[in-house]
Amino acid sequence: MATINSHLREPERVNLLSDHDDSDDDEVHVKRNPQMWPMSMASSAHAEAGIVDADGILPGCVGKANRMIRIAFLRKVLGIVGFQLLFTIGICAAIYNIPNSNQLLQKHAWIVFPNLLGSIALIIALHVYAREVPLNYVLLAAFTAVQAVTMGCVVTLFEAKVVLEAAVITGLVVASLFAYTLQNKRDFSVGYASMGSLLCVLLWAGIFQMFFMSPAVNFVINVFGAGLFCVLLVIDLDMIMYRFSPEDYICACVSLYMDILNLFIRILQIVAEANK
């Protein structure tokens, strides 16, 4: 076994922005594919068979395409996510500036539950119709609107200074993580399997905190959550490039958008605790 393993090629990744073309690689190994979102027609057969190449990369993914396709995909995804974030900021600002909005929303807290159900329904619809143009854009717009209203309800619970500071910190962190991931050749998807367990830990810690209401524990949970979503953002960006086809831009946008919102919520609570 030692002799055989010594001849196996180590996984190699390239700078996603560099000029290379691995579309002619033939070497494949059978491996379970963890991708949850649908892939292109060209690569779905490989996904169903669990086939990836020697680098652990799905054939037909963005990372295996030429530089022009990679850059075009990134521009499209980041452009859509940027529009989603700007729209969300606008809705949050509009809700925040409603007179006595925080008291109104606390009095009618039930408004959050229809948003939650709507988000779940739209996530399912986006999964099914991810490549059905223009329906996928309509569903994405509706999903963004629902999330924007939800975020608007959240930010009304905090002072404007805290919200602005958290938004700036989140923007700097996200930009740094994007730059690091796109320029790095490491395989970040190896940590994907452990994310589910860590998210469960975060969920149960949040439930625990609801009953005991300890400021110190709440701060630790939020710091842990912020770190977790930073790692998840890096992993998702890596998965998007090496487990998604160029046709899966809608799924990519949803993944990144939700990661950024979750990171913002954690940073918002950390900043609020620090300013007390």
Curated annotation (Swiss-Prot):
GO terms for molecular function: calcium channel activity. The chain crosses the membrane at residues 78-98, 110-130, 136-158, 163-182, 189-211, 216-235. Keywords: Membrane, Transmembrane, Transmembrane helix. InterPro entries: Bax_inhibitor_1-related. It comes from the Eukaryota. CDD domains: GAAP_like (cd10429). One of its GO terms (cellular component) is membrane. It is a multi-pass membrane protein. GO terms for biological process: endoplasmic reticulum unfolded protein response. It is found in: Membrane. The keyword ATP-binding does not apply. Belongs to the BI1 family. This is Transmembrane BAX inhibitor motif-containing protein 4.
